[in-house]
Swiss-Prot record:
InterPro entries: Flu_proapoptotic_PB1-F2 (IPR021045). This is Protein PB1-F2. May play an important role in promoting lung pathology in both primary viral infection and secondary bacterial infection. Residues 1-35 are annotated as: Disordered. Residues 20-34 have a biased composition (Basic and acidic residues).
């Protein structure tokens, strides 16, 4: 699937674009996964921080 679509891109831009596209596809996939985990961690931390802050107040 990706190779068929990459064929015209390679002829149009060059193999450099193909490498960049592959790298870009890998980066967002990892970032998306990290973003979700980070968000969950952030929410947990925020909840823990907000709870004691409210009690202190």
């Amino acid at each position: 699937m990706g190779q068929e679509q990459g064929t015209p891109w390679i002829q149009s831009t060059g193999h450099i674009s193909t490498q960049k596209g592959e790298d870009g596809q890998k980066t967002p996939k990892l970032e998306h996964r990290n973003s979700t985990q980070l968000m969950g961690h952030y929410q947990k931390t925020m909840n823990q921080v907000v709870m004691p802050k409210q009690i202190v107040y």
